[in-house]
């Protein structure tokens, strides 16, 4: 079951609450409220999404957490993004099916001037019992507080949780922050889980940790060879092939 996470310290979460209207209170657990949106439990806490630490509450309600959040970037533009969180070298559990379904839905509902993207794995929280997926609106206060923008996010969420395409579960190693393999996701060739960006220190241990934290077994890995130098590249390829993973070298 999906679990929605809203953070009162986050402007997009607050706008989402404004767009959706009242949600019935089911119970209070510690300092978080559990409410209901459609058929989905909603956990509401007072802090920022990256500060969330009540994973045990999420685990009691479902398996797949979706965090509604703002997106920020150095050169702001209207953006709808999705990604798995993780503060390297550790990461959250990634849900390739959900990340990819949300990306396809975001690109389907996106209207001018919004663009859509899958981001590399970055920032907390790190989960171990449930998968975590961040669904974001960017990249300035104008978009964060826009009912129209957050309405697009809401529409994508409702589209994605219906299910749909199931493609080859794939992790990506050495890519840019905004992944360059999005077209493969849109075509239904792959479902993307963890994306290890080129700017982190890529080691065999980092790749192993990411590989192990997915909701489904990884069947393919796309590795950008220019961004993963030997001997690490050879170690990573050997490890993945030993797991039965189809390794695709790019770049």
From Swiss-Prot:
GO biological process: D-amino acid catabolic process
Keywords linked to the UniProt accession: Hydrolase, Metal-binding, Zinc
Self-association state and partner proteins as the record states: Monomer.
Pfam families: tRNA_deacylase
Family per similarity comment: Belongs to the DtdA deacylase family.
Keyword Transmembrane helix: no
Cofactor(s) named in the record: Zn(2+)
This enzyme's EC code(s): 3.1.1.96
Function: D-aminoacyl-tRNA deacylase with broad substrate specificity. By recycling D-aminoacyl-tRNA to D-amino acids and free tRNA molecules, this enzyme counteracts the toxicity associated with the formation of D-aminoacyl-tRNA entities in vivo.
Comment on bound cofactor: Binds 2 Zn(2+) ions per subunit.
Gene that this sequence comes from: dtdA
Catalytic activity: a D-aminoacyl-tRNA + H2O = a tRNA + a D-alpha-amino acid + H(+); glycyl-tRNA(Ala) + H2O = tRNA(Ala) + glycine + H(+)
HAMAP family noted in UniProt: Deacylase_DtdA (MF_00562)
Protein name: D-aminoacyl-tRNA deacylase
Any one GO molecular function term: zinc ion binding
